[in-house]
């Protein structure tokens, strides 16, 4: 009988600890100002001269990526052209980045690619945020921009039933 009481006390102790942690997590979540975003949207990249471009929100991806081509390094400067001539937002303008990095990105099939990373900004919900973008060829993809968890964390909650939430607010 005493072992049953001990087990009950232990169970209640563990249960109280779990509930305290859940209450803490819930109160932390309530204090965060997160915006609901859908699975796809349209965004502006002011520093890159790109407006109203289709983006896909991908919580499975850690990094964010943008379609670009003609990527090359010349005398410690990264040069590239965003999008491609088939894309309606293509302007053919060559962009120069004196500050950039290289990172390893693991694809969904486990393959590792090394990509250039540049810092830029993105406008969503009429607010401008800093964003790290890896440069990749996404010409075979429906969305030229993929937004990953690194950018979404602590700013957005993704509702997969919604689309174009930010763009709809921009149109108002």
Residue ranges and their predicted role:
Residues 29-172:
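Pepsin/retropepsin-fold aspartyl endopeptidases
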Residues 16, 21-24:
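Polybasic, lysine-rich low-complexity intrinsically disordered segments
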Residues 4-6:
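General secretory precursor processing signal
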